Amino acid sequence: MRYHGDMLLTTPVISTLKQNYPDAKIDMLLYQDTIPILSENPEINALYGISNKGAGTFDKIKNVLSLIKTLRANNYDLVINLTDQWMVALLVRCLPARMKISQLYGHRQHGIWKKSFTHLAPIHGTHIVERNLSVLEPLGITDFYTDTTMSYAEDCWKKMRRELDALGVKDHYVVIQPTARQIFKCWDNDKFSKVIDALQQRGYQVVLTCGPSADDLACVDEIARGCETKPITGLAGKTRFPELGALIDHAVLFIGVDSAPGHIAAAVKTPVISLFGATDHVFWRPWTENIIQFWAGNYQKMPTRHELDRNKKYLSVIPAEDVIAATEKLLPEDAPSADRNAQL
């Protein structure tokens, strides 16, 4: 569990624990750079950060020793592990909790790993949310909360609304995040432009979002330049995760690829169009029924994980026309005239 989207997919575990143990204080250990996506969750008491992958060896050791000292002092009754990483198992060994649960990973059969926990739970489910929830089996819980949660403060939406007003965006807008961490998860820029044109011709304003990197911003710029009418790009690279959650929550539709914003859209119950390529589209799909998902494997055979070319856009086989048809299904009515006039 390394990335922002992964963190959202753990929230049903947090909610289920809080639902069954309402007086419990729930702390979470995660990578430092993923903290913002859960920073507004009211069910979490405290967030503790593990050094990111790029940190130096000395900084990592210092971070782990500091975490051990802090977490030991918290005197936990229960520790739940949702990752197969050795560092976490060794850290758990240092905590005096009465009950320590991990999932039973087939590739983690070493005695040191097994003895780091008091219980090893069999893994169940075809989706990561179901698999995460299966770790609670040793607790005998029967009442599960299965929705993901993306929390944000009211001030986040107030800020986004002010920004949207300044950009001339009305109520019926669509958020599109075309970028992902790796190119093999991305779709063609010109196809995004075609989808945007189709939406804007029906009166919907399109807000493009992305991360702050130069590559992400260049992608958004190229897509915008390929459109007949330029979409809204003023928020690209400028939203924190809670603000992005607020922005997507108030959108009429979200369109994206295999990345965290799709999971945010699912969590806030905004309709989703999601495009997947050479990744597990069942296991990692946004956890919602209000979704139209495109998998490149339905158009062309996808490579196995070991054959994957990370510099290839596998999503290119998905036609823009199919995605446009999906927008018409999820948004069967044109935007109200007030929104259409805002684009003039």
Curated annotation (Swiss-Prot):
Coiled coil regions in record: none
GO CC, one annotated term: cytosol
SUPFAM superfamilies (alphabetical): UDP-Glycosyltransferase/glycogen phosphorylase
EC id: 2.4.99.25
Pathway annotation: Bacterial outer membrane biogenesis; LPS core biosynthesis
Top EC class of this enzyme: transferase
Glycosyltransferase found in the keyword field: yes
CDD domains noted in UniProt: GT9_LPS_heptosyltransferase
Pfam families with a match to the protein in the record: Glyco_transf_9 (PF01075)
UniProtKB keywords: Glycosyltransferase, Lipopolysaccharide biosynthesis, Transferase
Domain of life: Bacteria
The UniProt record lists the keyword Transmembrane helix: no
Mutant lacking the gene: phenotype: Disruption of the gene, which likely inactivates the entire waa operon due to downstream polarity, leads to a mutant (MD42) that grows and survives in vitro in undiluted, highly viscous cecal mucus isolated directly from the mouse cecum, but is unable to colonize the mouse large intestine. Mutant MD42 is hypersensitive to sodium dodecyl sulfate (SDS), bile salts and the hydrophobic antibiotic novobiocin. Furthermore, its LPS core oligosaccharide is truncated.
GO MF, one annotated term: lipopolysaccharide core heptosyltransferase activity
Disulfides per UniProt: none
Gene Ontology terms describing biological process: lipopolysaccharide core region biosynthetic process
Signal sequence interval, chain numbering: none
Reaction catalyzed: an L-alpha-D-Hep-(1->3)-4-O-phospho-L-alpha-D-Hep-(1->5)-[alpha-Kdo-(2->4)]-alpha-Kdo-(2->6)-lipid A + ADP-L-glycero-beta-D-manno-heptose = an L-alpha-D-Hep-(1->7)-L-alpha-D-Hep-(1->3)-4-O-phospho-L-alpha-D-Hep-(1->5)-[alpha-Kdo-(2->4)]-alpha-Kdo-(2->6)-lipid A + ADP + H(+); L-alpha-D-Hep-(1->3)-4-O-phospho-L-alpha-D-Hep-(1->5)-[alpha-Kdo-(2->4)]-alpha-Kdo-(2->6)-lipid A (E. coli) + ADP-L-glycero-beta-D-manno-heptose = L-alpha-D-Hep-(1->7)-L-alpha-D-Hep-(1->3)-4-O-phospho-L-alpha-D-Hep-(1->5)-[alpha-Kdo-(2->4)]-alpha-Kdo-(2->6)-lipid A (E. coli) + ADP + H(+)
Family in the record: Belongs to the glycosyltransferase 9 family.
Role: Glycosyltransferase involved in the biosynthesis of the core oligosaccharide region of lipopolysaccharide (LPS). Catalyzes the addition of the third heptose unit (HepIII) to the second heptose unit (HepII) of the phospho-Hep2-Kdo2-lipid A module.
NCBIfam families given in the database record: heptsyl_trn_III, PRK10422.1
Protein name (Swiss-Prot/TrEMBL): Lipopolysaccharide heptosyltransferase 3
Organism listed in the record: Escherichia coli (strain K12)
